[in-house]
Amino acid sequence: MRILAVEDEPEYLEMLQEVMNSLGHTIVIAPNGKEGLAVLESQTIDVVVSDVKMPEMSGVEFHRRVREHPEHRNTPFIFLTGVDDLTEVRAACKTDSDLLLQKPFPIDKLLKMFSGKMK
C-alpha cells in the first residue's frame, strides 16, 4: 500500500514512517497540503493521512481539494488532529472513507484503522 502522509510535525512523520514501513507499506511524505497535492498528481496513492493544522493550507482545505479529483473521491483519508474543536473536521468527514484520529493517539488505534478500513 502507498500512503501519503501530509504532516508538519517531525515526530508524527517519524512514527508514521516507522510503523507503516514495518508493515511493508510505502510512505510518501509531504510537509504541507500544497506539496501533498503535487504528490497526488504525480504518484499512485492508496491512502492519505493528513494533519489538520498546517502552514499554507489546512488539512480540511487539503481534503476538499483531494476530493475534487475524481480518482481520489473515495481514497481513504485519515485526519490527524490535536485541536479540541472538531466541528470543521467532522463536517468534512462525509463518507466512510474519511476517518478522524485525535492526537496523541495509541499506535494500535492507527493500526486498527488501517487494517479495518484500508483493505
Model-predicted segments: where are they?
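Active-site beta3 strand of CheY-like receiver
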Residues: 44-49
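Conserved acidic carboxylate
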Residues: 7
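Helix N-cap/capping motif at the beta->alpha junctions
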Residues: 29-38, 59
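Receiver (REC) domain active-site loop signature in two-component systems and cognate sites
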Residues: 54
